[in-house]
Amino acid sequence: VEFRNFDKALDAFKTALEFQKGDFNVRFNIAEIKFVSQKYQESLVDLESLLKDASGNSNYTGMIPLVKFKSLLCKLKLKDVDGAKEYIGDSDFLSDSPIYYYGNAALEYNSGNSAEAEKWLARARRVFGNPQTLGPWQDTLIEFGYIKSFYGGDLELESGPPTGE
């Protein structure tokens, strides 16, 4: 996936899934490929299935917030703002993950409020501090087109949502 050959990566993960039936991580990677390929409806179906299967399973507790965040973004792309809000409805500033901050930032970006979105991201950086913790969340916003990559590539986002400029 890192080399942006999504078709090849998707084929590889589908093959892996044949050998590792129902494997959560393989299924997550398939949903992720659909997400970065802007197949948001397909990704959402896969992500919601992961959430259902992960519910109550302590092995996946750490992944649930990121899966919810990606689901929230899919809902925004599909113009279901109320549905998107549901994914952060049970979170607050005491949450163990950045979902509260990044979810609210995404909602602000979606509403065209870039300055407010940046405030939410700054709060997340202050609260969580560790770039490794925030990396997947930041990468997700980059893939979605709300923020620019540190490595350039801005011009590739022409078909993505507005970046607030």
Which residues does each predicted region cover?
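Register position in tetratricopeptide repeats
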Residues: 2, 19, 36-37, 77, ...
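Solenoid-like repeat scaffolds
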Residues: 14-21, 49-60, 88-97, 122-131, ...
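Residue-level recognition of tetratricopeptide repeat
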Residues: 32, 73, 104-107
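Terminal, low-structured helical/coil segments at or just beyond the last alpha-helical repeat
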Residues: 114-165
